[in-house]
Design a protein with these regions (language model features):
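A short, internal acetyl-CoA/4′-phosphopantetheine-binding micro-motif in the GNAT/acyltransferase core
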Residues: 78-89, 169-176, 205
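Conserved acetyl-CoA-binding loop-helix of GNAT-fold acetyltransferases
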Residues: 89-102, 171, 177-190, 194, ...
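A structural microfeature
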Residues: 58-60, 124-127, 152, 224
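Conserved N-terminal entry element of GNAT/NAT acetyltransferase domains
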Residues: 1-12, 133-146, 236-242
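Conserved donor-binding loop and adjoining core beta-sheet/short helix segment
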Residues: 2, 7-11, 22-105, 152-164
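Acyl-donor-binding surface of acyltransferase catalytic domains
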Residues: 68, 73, 85-143, 229-231
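Conserved hydrophobic beta-strand within the GNAT/NAT acetyltransferase core sheet
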Residues: 79, 109-114, 166, 200-204
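Intrinsically disordered, low-complexity segments enriched in Gly and acidic/Ser/Thr residues
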Residues: 144-173, 182, 192
Length: 242
């Protein structure tokens, strides 16, 4: 079995990738997005279907994209992996990841998973990203893309016809720990004019403890999450790759 690297997929390849993701979702009771908006794709095809006894076109896939930030001067790649349920524990993940390491030696690797664990395989847990949602009763009008206060600012966009996306909340340093973040949110979400927006959604990093505490106090609910793991290639004491 060979590992193939691609930067783009044709329609047939997209169907094959989505079939494998759907199969893994059913097996693992997860709900990974079927979208394929990634920068690169590694795959292992099911070239010997009679031998494997499996109908799917792909046995394993690894997909990733470059995050818009750096760590110690190196770009960060976020990657996710799907291995056919009947082919797990047979080294396919290792084949994919070794190809990734060889091709992206100067990048930091992080693996994304739906489930939070202390470690994913031998990769240590780093942090989680939570997707929060709050129902607005009554519905409100659009509060504005940028709303300024003497002590901070908040930023919104329209996610769809019924939902707002809160993508920024800033409180000046000298006003922090005084309840100003809560005051901003309550003014926007509870005192705005009546309108059509029934929900507000946002994303928050689990390492931002103050923000998580605020949103939980404001009755936001966790609707989904992604956990990230340090995917750096393991090295021996002599500095060589394991």
């Amino acid at each position: 079995m060979d590992v193939q690297l691609q930067l783009d997929l044709n329609e047939e390849e997209e169907r094959g990738f989505k079939d494998l993701i759907l199969l893994c979702n059913k097996e693992d009771e997860t709900d990974y997005d079927m979208g394929l908006d990634y920068d690169f794709f590694y795959s292992i095809r099911n070239e010997e279907k009679k031998e494997s006894g499996l109908k799917e076109e792909y046995l394993a896939i690894l997909m990733g994209y470059k995050l818009g930030e750096q760590e110690e001067g190196k770009d960060i790649l976020l990657c996710t992996v799907f291995v056919h349920p009947f082919m797990r524990g047979q080294g396919l993940f290792t084949m994919l990841s070794e190809s990734l390491y060889d091709d992206f030696r100067e990048q930091r690797i992080r693996f994304m998973r739906k489930n939070k664990e202390e470690s994913f395989l031998h990769f240590p847990y780093l942090y989680s990203e939570y997707f929060l949602e709050k129902t607005l009763e009554p519905p409100i009008a659009f509060p504005g893309e940028r709303r300024s206060y003497p002590f901070g600012e908040v930023y919104f966009s329209a996610y769809n016809e019924k939902s707002l996306y809160l993508y920024g909340l800033m409180v000046e340093n000298r006003f922090r720990r005084q309840g100003k973040g809560e005051a901003i949110l309550r003014d926007c979400l509870e005192k705005s004019e009546a309108g059509v927006y029934e929900k507000v959604i946002l994303q928050v990093d689990s390492r931002n403890k103050a923000a998580m505490k605020l949103y939980m106090k404001m009755d936001f609910e966790i609707k989904d999450s992604l956990s990230y793991y340090d995917g750096e290639r393991k090295r021996r004491k002599d500095g060589k790759d394991i």
